[in-house]
């Protein structure tokens, strides 16, 4: 970060706006995250709100675009399901009005494919235990899927795979 922003408190509305622009060169922020970041840096609430309003006016902060970018970043995580996506959207302070839109774009087929990948990962990690499939391993498989945000329906994929391995 430039030295002008490193230790100095933000005392004018222009300094606050410049600092906010500087932050946006690194990544997107939601309006609430930007306000919080500016206030933590020492900006007065009024200056921070003015800066965020100006950034919104010039479309530097766009909540819909931010929601889409959070979703795109989440898609790179291959082993997670629908519930994890929803939790991630809330954690990143995506506006409530955009969460259903993002959730709609994540299809059942995509979730099933991700569940399959997660199942393969679990089977690889537990390859030496597969010859003795028991309730403990099945429970571990279901916990593995649940921890990654998959529903019970998706967790059955791993149980079926474990039964297949036991039948072989």
Map each language-model feature to its residues:
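An alpha-helical, amphipathic repeat domain used for nucleic-acid recognition
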Residues: 1-168
